[in-house]
Amino acid sequence: MGDWLLEAATAYNRDSYEQRDRYASHLLIPLETMRTVIRWSMESIPDEVLIGFDPNPERPNPEAVEEAFGPPQSSFSGSGFLLGEPHIVNVGDSYSVHHVPEEWTDGAFSEERGARGSRFASFLHSHPNAYAHPSQADAEAADWTEGVEMILGVRFSPAPLGLEWYDQEDGHRRDLKPEKDEELPVLARVAGRKVHGFELIGYLRNGEGVNLLITSPEGFPIGLDL
């Protein structure tokens, strides 16, 4: 992935800092975790991938981050700790991807927990050639997420029929790409396709946005001097 992800994380975190007042909570994502998530999302194209996480209980958020972004006004499972290791839960289309296979579910509670009846606190799924904006299926699945629900939009070309990219202006957009003058840069290549950019958002099951930060292993946001 080269150095573009470091540049993208720096730009993303600066935006997170500038917009910190619009969010009631924040979540720290280690850079290498983000790198893995991006790789899995690219490798799964044209399908979506569902990834599960638990918080890392050995990595509380650094005090400097809490001071800069303020104490969270909304609580969620894993709040106050870095995001833990990623695990691929499922790969499929926009509806089937939200089904959690039996090996990841807690049988005693799966019926009560609905579509997300698994042991993971937080989830991320990819949107191939689509904005990072929750669909109706996404919103219904998020009703059972106790932590943070995240979406990674992936823009690529050439696109299979039915997965063409359409520009839209509505909604809150959070780009994850380097600050370059190129309108359509090529960040990576996979299976004969060019990957041009990403979007990344997080939200709680009540629809409230979560401010995401990409960090060092210790939890310090890349590119921010706190």
Q: Model-flagged regions — what are they?
A:
Residues 1-122, 128-226:
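Conserved beta-strand-loop surface patch within small alpha/beta domains used
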